[in-house]
Each structure stands twice: as structure tokens, then as C-alpha cells.
Amino acid sequence: GKDASFAPGDSAKGAKLFQTRCAQCHTVEAGGPHKVGPNLHGLFGRKTGQSEGYAYTDANKQAGVTWDENTLFSYLENPKKFIPGTKMAFGGLKKGKERNDLITYLKESTA
């Protein structure tokens, strides 16, 4: 269906989603601290489990996925299905539109 893959979304809406759903555990800026989850700066084009100085699960390190718009689109729908064994305690964003908005924001904010 139309929600099957990434399409550019609304960055401002994505920023709000990040603040309410992600910012408790993640920072995005260069040099930002790791919190419960890793800092996300430089996320796009990086493999899973590679943010310097963060203690990942083996599942995350071994997933061998490269983060881009489409892998994030799948992952954020159901993180534990995409990477079984991840410690990210987030149920996912079921609406494709919300994932598009969030990923559009992440592309800008983590670059």
C-alpha cells in the first residue's frame, strides 16, 4: 500500500514526535551525550550498533543493517521485530505518515 516505504514528510511534525517519543532516550546533535539510548548524530549511512562509546546489545551490533530512510521506516514500525534482541523499549510508530515525518526530521537534525 501507500505506506509501504519512505516518502518525504513534515520535519516540524517530526521534531514534535521526536520530543514526545524519542528525546527521553536519544540526543541528535554532534557531541550529544548518550542517554538510555545512543546519540543519533551521523545516523544515516552508518551500520547498526556503531555509535562510539555506547553499550549496544549483541543483537544490535550483529544486525548488519545500514541506516537509511527505508531501513528506519521498517525499523520504527516495529523495532523488536526488525532487530530481535534490541534493548530499545519503544513499541514503534504504526502510522507511515508519522514515520515519514520523524525520519525527515532525523535526516536534518543528525546530519
UniProtKB/Swiss-Prot annotation:
Modification N6,N6,N6-trimethyllysine occurs at: K80
Post-translational modification: Binds 1 heme c group covalently per subunit.
Membrane-spanning intervals of the chain: none
Pfam families for the chain: Cytochrom_C (PF00034)
The entry's keywords: Electron transport, Heme, Iron, Metal-binding, Methylation, Mitochondrion, Respiratory chain, Transport
Annotated localization: Mitochondrion intermembrane space
Cellular-component GO terms for this entry: mitochondrial intermembrane space
Recorded GO MF terms: electron transfer activity; heme binding; metal ion binding
Main location: mitochondrion
Binding annotation for heme c: C22, C25, H26, M88
Entries under InterPro entries matching the protein: Cyt_c-like_dom (IPR009056), Cyt_c-like_dom_sf (IPR036909), Cyt_c_1A/1B (IPR002327)
PANTHER family linked: CYTOCHROME C (PTHR11961)
Family: Belongs to the cytochrome c family.
Annotated function: Electron carrier protein. The oxidized form of the cytochrome c heme group can accept an electron from the heme group of the cytochrome c1 subunit of cytochrome reductase. Cytochrome c then transfers this electron to the cytochrome oxidase complex, the final protein carrier in the mitochondrial electron-transport chain.
Protein's recorded name: Cytochrome c
